[in-house]
Curated annotation (Swiss-Prot):
UniProt name for this protein: Serine hydroxymethyltransferase
Site annotation Plays an important role in substrate specificity: residues: 225
Keyword annotations of the record: Amino-acid biosynthesis, Cytoplasm, One-carbon metabolism, Pyridoxal phosphate, Transferase
EC number: 2.1.2.1
Gene Ontology BP terms: glycine biosynthetic process from serine; tetrahydrofolate interconversion
Family: Belongs to the SHMT family.
Classification via HAMAP family: SHMT
UniProt keyword Transferase, yes or no: yes
The protein's annotated pathway: One-carbon metabolism; tetrahydrofolate interconversion; Amino-acid biosynthesis; glycine biosynthesis; glycine from L-serine: step 1/1
CDD domains for this protein: SHMT (cd00378)
Residues where N6-(pyridoxal phosphate)lysine is found: 226
């Protein structure tokens, strides 16, 4: 019966087109990366056939003896990678990881404090269009106008004034290190839980290149892709197993049913890869590439928000060049360089236009790009933005990309 099924040519033609787009372009979106072949093999395995509601040793379905071992392997590797006492690898996404944690630590109507989306925060840190902004009272902190760095004095003042139940540290567009110790001191002062969302920089934490939030946070959430280079999914960590038990119940049966065990297998592979010495060298190059690319663009007259970066990403203020983020994204996309338009701190333009772009180096570093090649990448970006798209420039980008094979 199965052997007579007709191949879905239309769908697989689209997959081939997407593979061609990825192979022939430069991926500079900070939240994207290329997984290894063994991660793809795990995610595409027969594990996708199995339902496994519950947790290892406590399932609501039979036949989970192998699945239990797969999930347990992912849990133990996650704990070892980040130095955590407890881990939940079932969240389908970072947003669902955050939702479960909030629901475990707060009641609807309680006060949540997080970084303003306009300053670099994430939708789930209190945006009014997100569940976090609808279920909870939200207080947002931002950055200083003069330095574009987090204003810890403002964080403390707002915390003392509003007494939040949860304070979130973490962002989707902040290029500098976080002072987790200072955030924990503020949280303790007002009796709040500190939740760190390390979705963007988890891989750098694993490699020892970014401060680890586990010694300070009550709970840490993350995605498993981005700098961690795994499949798309979520992860929750804590050094408090009692809090972990509460969060377990909120993931299942609270907001999810059956876990995606094929994706959890891919997470296990990614954790295994991140535990290898090679991952530290990869992560070092991610940061060095970001620093060098930011420096090269600054040398060409672009203003880099905060003056540089400590991690895998940076923001470019395009106003000195007379461009919007939307225009820049479109021009770069036309020559095969993918970035995303992004608001800069105190941006006067609307979110669908923006004054800036966000650039990240995890994906091109996976393909073997080195700091010595960043001047060329900066030159291609500069030419696309100032001269506009051309077939000749598109071909230059294509040749450069093909010289760095995808995994």
């Amino acid at each position: 019966m199965v052997s007579t099924l007709k191949r879905d040519e239309a769908l697989f033609e689209l997959i081939a087109l997407e593979e061609k787009r990825q192979r022939e372009g430069l991926e500079l979106i900070a939240s994207e990366n290329f997984v290894s072949k063994q991660v793809r093999e795990a995610v595409g395995s027969v594990l996708t056939n199995k339902y496994a509601e519950g947790y290892p040793g406590a399932r609501y379905y039979g036949g989970c003896e192998v699945i239990d071992r797969v999930e347990s392997l992912a849990i133990e590797r996650a704990k070892a990678l980040f130095g955590a006492a407890w881990a939940n690898v079932q969240p389908h996404s970072g947003s669902q990881a955050n939702m479960a944690v909030y629901m475990a630590l707060m009641e609807p109507g309680d006060t949540l404090m997080g970084m303003d989306l306009a300053a670099g925060g994430h939708l789930t840190h209190g945006s009014r269009v997100n569940f976090s902004g609808k279920l909870y009272k939200v207080v947002s902190y931002g950055v200083r106008p003069d330095t574009e760095l987090i204003d810890l004095e403002e964080v403390r003042r707002l915390a003392l004034e509003h007494r939040p139940k949860v304070i979130v540290a973490g962002a989707s567009a902040y290029p500098r290190f976080w002072d987790f110790k200072a955030f924990r001191e503020i949280a303790d002062e007002v009796g709040a839980y500190l939740v760190v969302d390390m979705a963007h920089f988890a891989g750098l934490v694993a490699a020892g290149l970014h401060p680890n939030p586990l010694p300070y946070a009550h709970v840490v959430t993350s995605t498993t892709h981005k700098t961690l280079r795994g499949p798309r999914g979520g992860l929750i960590l804590s050094n408090d197993p009692e809090l972990g038990k509460r969060i377990d119940k909120l993931i299942f049966p609270g907001i999810q049913g059956g876990p995606l065990e094929h994706v959890i297998a891919g997470k296990a592979v990614a954790f295994f890869e991140a535990l290898q010495p090679e991952f530290k060298e990869y992560s070092r190059l991610v940061v060095e590439n970001a620093k060098r690319l930011a420096e090269e663009l600054a040398r060409r007259g672009y203003r880099i928000v905060t003056g540089g970066t400590d991690n895998h990403l940076f923001l470019v203020d395009l106003r000195p060049k007379g461009l919007t983020g939307k225009e820049a994204e479109e021009r770069l996309d036309a020559v095969g360089i993918t970035v995303n338009k992004n608001a800069i701190p105190f941006d006067p333009k609307p979110p669908r236009v923006t004054s800036g772009i966000r650039i990240g180096t995890p994906a091109i570093t996976t393909r073997g790009f080195t700091p010595e090649e960043m001047p060329l990448v900066a030159e291609l970006i500069d030419r696309a933005l100032l001269e506009g798209p051309s077939e000749a420039l598109r071909e230059e980008v294509r040749r450069l990309a093909l010289a760095h094979p995808m995994p």
